[in-house]
Amino acid sequence: MFSHTKKVGPTGRFGPRYGLKIRVRVRDVEIKAKKKYKCPVCGFPKLKRASTSIWVCGKCGAKIAGGAYTPETGAGKAVMKAIRRIVERKEE
C-alpha cells in the first residue's frame, strides 16, 4: 500500500487525522531527519542520522554529535560564526 503522495510526503500515513499544521511540521522534521548531509570530516554527502543527535558517516565511519533532526543546530552555527570572527580578528 502506497502511504504518501507528492504533496503530503511521509505524513500521508496519518490521513486526515491530527490537523494540517501539525502534519506539515512533522513532514518538515521527518524530511530533514532522513536527508543525507555532508560529512564535516571527509566532505562526502554520506552523513546519516543514527539516533537522536547522533550522526554517522557512511564513508569514513565518523560519529558526530549534532542536533536532534539536523547535524548542525542554529545555535551551533551562530557559535561557529562567532569563533571564526574572533580568529580572524586575532590574525589581523
Swiss-Prot record:
Disulfide bonds: none annotated. A zinc finger (C4-type) spans 39-60. SUPFAM superfamilies: Zn-binding ribosomal proteins (SSF57829). Zn(2+) binds at residues 39, 42, 57, 60. One of its GO terms (biological process) is translation. GO terms for molecular function: large ribosomal subunit rRNA binding; structural constituent of ribosome; zinc ion binding. Gene3D superfamilies: 2.20.25.30. It holds the Pfam family Ribosomal_L37ae. Its cofactor is Zn(2+). The keyword Transport does not apply. Binds 1 zinc ion per subunit. GO terms for cellular component: cytosolic ribosome; ribonucleoprotein complex. Keywords: Metal-binding, Ribonucleoprotein, Ribosomal protein, RNA-binding, rRNA-binding, Zinc, Zinc-finger. HAMAP family: Ribosomal_eL43. Belongs to the eukaryotic ribosomal protein eL43 family. Putative zinc-binding subfamily. Binds to the 23S rRNA. Part of the 50S ribosomal subunit. This is Large ribosomal subunit protein eL43. It comes from Methanocaldococcus jannaschii (strain ATCC 43067 / DSM 2661 / JAL-1 / JCM 10045 / NBRC 100440) (Methanococcus jannaschii). The gene is rpl37ae.
